[in-house]
Amino acid sequence: MQLTDFKALTFDCYGTLIDWETGIVNALQPLAKRTGKTFTSDELLEVFGRNESPQQTETPGALYQDILRAVYDRIAKEWGLEPDAAEREEFGTSVKNWPAFPDTVEALQYLKKHYKLVILSNIDRNEFKLSNAKLGVEFDHIITAQDVGSYKPNPNNFTYMIDALAKAGIEKKDILHTAESLYHDHIPANDAGLVSAWIYRRHGKEGYGATHVPSRMPNVDFRFNSMGEMAEAHKQALKG
């Protein structure tokens, strides 16, 4: 199996293309400071991860900024703090401040020459526009949680994507799902019968960061530590 075997790359955005962990850590600082305690970045990411996914399951039709507001409330309660309205609103709308990884734009611009590029993201359409402006390419298809009515790892999100691409003439065997999160992406991609590439952004770090702990270790067909590494591997594959 080679990277050149596929026609479409379907991407998770946050954690894969956008550095949501930096964004989340920064956005949680005001609330964290009010505890009077010192948290490591991983501790902040873990409290986010164990509150975000349950909230998405409870309110699958909510816009992502409303998910973030609810996550803020859950974390404040966990820490024994009263919510602050201004903090809550800033956290809820913090996606606009989340940066792209340094290698993302160059890698996407290269890969765009060889594949259809597709987004499958736990976000709403308006929030994704803010991130899309940082990614440097025009995606061929954009599928959000708002479009589907649920959040990954719900299998409906993958069924929706596979069906949408089939209508565009792209068969499931021609799709390479490309993502960081084992929980949100690789387990349901396995279950959907998709080939997948793991962008292991947390290589060298312990734990799962801002993502929920996966129930099992899924199969991944390719593994790269960055999007830049994936683009370079494609160049080498072309050389044979």
UniProtKB/Swiss-Prot annotation:
Q: Name one GO cellular component term.
A: periplasmic space
Signal peptide location in the record?
Answer: none
Provide the reaction this enzyme catalyses.
(S)-azetidine-2-carboxylate + H2O = 2-hydroxy-4-aminobutanoate
The protein's matches in InterPro entries, at most eight in alphabetical order, are given as: 2-HAD, HAD-like_sf, HAD-SF_hydro_IA, HAD_sf, S-2-haloacid_dehalogenase
List where the protein spans the membrane.
none
Q: What does this protein do?
A: Catalyzes the hydrolysis of the toxic natural product azetidine-2-carboxylate (an L-proline analog) by opening the azetidine ring to produce 2-hydroxy-4-aminobutanoate. Is thus involved in the detoxification of this compound but also in the degradation pathway of azetidine-2-carboxylate that allows Pseudomonas sp. A2C to grow on azetidine-2-carboxylate as the sole source of nitrogen. Does not show any detectable 2-haloacid dehalogenase activity with either (R)- or (S)-2-chloropropionate as the substrate, and is not able to hydrolyze L-proline.
Quaternary data? Monomer.
- Protein name in UniProt: L-azetidine-2-carboxylate hydrolase
User: Where is the protein found, in the record's own terms?
Assistant: Periplasm
What's the source species for this entry? Pseudomonas sp. (strain A2C)
Give its E.C. classification number: 3.5.-.-
